[in-house]
């Protein structure tokens, strides 16, 4: 079988906040639901959150239409305050991993967040990539590439606003 070659999606963003606060916004349950949704009209609720290396978090997002989407996040690496690596899956309310709701969407996508700080500004590099995609999954990934920044980009806008609010700016 031939290995499928593809490029990950990389989003870079600077936040006017210390690196420790940005890291905590990614790793503390009380921060996550304040920003980790595609837009401000979507609500979030955690059922469980063991945000540690090897741990899992389980939450739902509720869309303005009332539709709910459950997500299970498995944490692979947490290096305070520099690196966060996780894989997120669609799941049932009970935490069972479900097939993606989008046709041919990769079953497993890993996110790697790298943080660095200079002069009170935290730079984030967010890398998003499928793990062992089938040919159809790789094609769906590439076809959707222009949209990759929209969902996470909306979340990162909310994160910037939330960090400013927390800092009292």
Q: Over which residues does each language-model region extend?
A:
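Short, highly charged C-terminal tails/helix-capping segments
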Residues: 161-169
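Hydrophobic pocket/interface hotspot
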Residues: 22-23, 32, 57, 75, ...
């Amino acid at each position: 079988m031939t290995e499928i070659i593809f490029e990950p999606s990389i989003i870079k963003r600077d936040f006017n906040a210390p690196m420790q606060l940005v890291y905590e916004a990614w790793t503390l349950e009380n921060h996550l639901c304040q920003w980790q949704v595609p837009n401000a009209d979507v609500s979030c609720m955690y059922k469980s959150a063991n945000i540690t290396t090897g741990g899992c978090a389980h939450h739902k997002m509720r869309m303005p239409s009332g539709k709910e989407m459950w997500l299970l996040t498995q944490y692979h690496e947490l290096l305070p305050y520099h690196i966060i690596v996780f894989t997120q899956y669609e799941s049932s309310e009970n935490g069972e991993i479900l097939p993606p709701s989008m046709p041919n969407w990769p079953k497993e996508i890993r996110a790697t967040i790298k943080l660095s700080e200079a002069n009170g500004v935290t730079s984030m590099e967010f890398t998003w990539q499928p793990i062992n995609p089938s040919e159809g999954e790789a094609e769906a990934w590439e076809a959707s590439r222009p949209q990759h920044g929209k969902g996470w980009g909306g979340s990162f806008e909310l994160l910037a606003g939330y960090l400013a609010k927390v800092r009292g700016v």
